């Protein structure tokens, strides 16, 4: 349990770097823009672009640290598996559903995916040597959440990478939140 918590605590720091305060910022600013579809789509694309960039930076830092610290590099497969959760949390853009207050979908999705995760744990994780299996099963709900969000969010807008000068404005606003 101690080793598992160690890995998860390290990953949580990189998740914070990837988030960069974006969910809080996106919900607070996006809620006021959601009625103007064109304006909101542009805003969502810009914030999503920042989210992808911060995730890239976070995963790159994780890769450098895992490569430099010998005890981390011995367990590189675990770090790769756990970094998938960072990537899919970004791709899922949960903040978009929060902007539109679609809590019913979020709740149902959460319940079904977590039940599936618990069932998988009971089926595949038998003892303390199954740590890699545990981490894979730990990441599966993140992947399913990200994919289901991505499919469901299309009813609100189609997120895409958009690089323009407005990103600098959002970046300045995000630093105090981060």
PLM region spans:
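Membrane-interface helix-capping segments at transmembrane helix termini in multi-pass transporters
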Residues: 1-6, 33-45, 56-87, 127-135
């Amino acid at each position: 349990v101690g080793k598992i918590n160690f890995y998860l605590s390290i990953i949580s720091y990189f998740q914070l770097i990837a988030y960069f305060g974006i969910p809080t910022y996106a919900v607070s600013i996006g809620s006021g823009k959601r009625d103007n579809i064109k304006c909101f789509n542009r805003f969502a694309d810009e914030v999503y672009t920042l989210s992808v960039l911060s995730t890239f930076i976070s995963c790159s830092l994780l890769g450098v640290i895992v490569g430099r610290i010998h005890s981390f590099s011995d367990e590189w497969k675990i770090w790769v598996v756990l970094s998938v959760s960072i990537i899919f949390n970004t791709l899922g853009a949960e903040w978009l559903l929060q902007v539109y207050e679609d809590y019913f979908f979020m709740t149902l999705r959460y319940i079904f995916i977590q039940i599936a995760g618990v069932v998988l744990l009971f089926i595949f994780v038998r003892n303390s040597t199954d740590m890699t299996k545990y981490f894979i099963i730990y990441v599966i709900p993140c992947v399913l959440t990200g994919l289901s969000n991505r499919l469901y969010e299309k009813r609100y807008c189609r997120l895409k990478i958009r690089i323009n000068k407005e990103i600098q404005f959002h970046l300045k606003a995000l630093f105090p939140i981060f």
